């Protein structure tokens, strides 16, 4: 093969643009053709914080009424059969029990934070109840 003379070409001082691969070109043009949009994903913990703020603002009951009512009737049957409850009595029980549970979880969270953790554990609830004097 005969040698050919190379001619110098003018340099612009930057790299020549690369040619796109066929897969990249197809990938970039796919959403424009009406592909399904991926749902927005929040960072871990963001949704939990939104829920915390939402439930702290609200005053509605968090436990469903009918399952709670069934639980009350089931527990009451152990003491006496054929007991009847006024709806206001069940609501008062539910308000009191939810207030107790919210307070218990607040104190339990403080115990977990004191132990340099962010997740509550059964031992935190046990410690909280022991400090409160509910369980010896």
From Swiss-Prot:
- What keywords sit in the KW lines? Acetylation, ADP-ribosylation, Chromosome, DNA-binding, Hydroxylation, Methylation, Nucleosome core, Nucleus, Phosphoprotein, Ubl conjugation
| Residues that bear ADP-ribosylserine | 11, 29
The name this protein goes by in its record: Histone H3.3C
Instruction: Give an example GO cellular component term for this record.
Output: nucleus
Q: Which residues carry this modification: Phosphotyrosine?
A: 42
Q: Which family does it belong to?
A: Belongs to the histone H3 family.
- Give the top-rank taxon of the lineage listed in the UniProt record for this protein: Eukaryota
Q: Which residues carry this modification: N6-butyryllysine?
A: 19, 24
Q: Where is the composition biased (Polar residues)?
A: 1-10
What's the main place this protein lives?
nucleus
For the modification 5-glutamyl serotonin, the affected residues are: 6
Q: Which residues carry this modification: N6-(2-hydroxyisobutyryl)lysine?
A: 5, 10, 15, 19, 24, 28, 37, 57, 65, 80, 123
Q: Which residues carry this modification: Phosphothreonine?
A: 4, 7, 12, 81
Q: Which Pfam families match?
A: Histone
What gene does the UniProt entry assign to this protein? H3-5
N6-methyllysine, modified sites:
5
In its UniProt entry, the species of origin is given as Cairina moschata (Muscovy duck)
Region (Disordered) spans which residues?
Answer: 1-39
Report whether Ubl conjugation shows up as a keyword of the record. Answer: yes
Q: Which residues carry this modification: N6,N6,N6-trimethyllysine?
A: 5
Modification type N6-methylated lysine: residues: 10, 19, 28, 37, 65, 80, 123
What GO molecular function annotations does the UniProt record carry, in alphabetical order?
A: DNA binding; protein heterodimerization activity; structural constituent of chromatin
Give the modified residues of type Allysine: 5
Spell out which residues are annotated as carrying N6,N6-dimethyllysine: 5
Q: List-wise, which residues carry N6-succinyllysine? A: 57, 80, 123
Q: Which residues cross the membrane?
A: none
């Amino acid at each position: 093969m005969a040698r050919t003379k190379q001619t110098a070409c003018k340099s612009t001082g930057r790299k020549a643009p690369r040619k796109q691969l066929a897969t990249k070109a197809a990938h970039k043009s796919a959403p424009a053709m009406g592909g399904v949009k991926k749902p927005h994903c929040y960072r871990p913990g963001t949704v939990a914080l939104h829920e915390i703020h939402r439930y702290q603002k609200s005053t509605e009951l968090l436990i469903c009424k009918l399952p709670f009512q069934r639980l009350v009737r089931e527990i009451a049957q152990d003491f006496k059969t054929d007991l009847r409850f006024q709806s206001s009595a069940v609501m008062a029980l539910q308000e009191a029990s939810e207030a107790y549970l919210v307070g218990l979880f607040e104190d339990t969270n403080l115990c977990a934070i004191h132990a340099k953790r962010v997740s509550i554990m059964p031992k935190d609830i046990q410690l909280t109840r022991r400090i409160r004097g509910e369980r010896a």
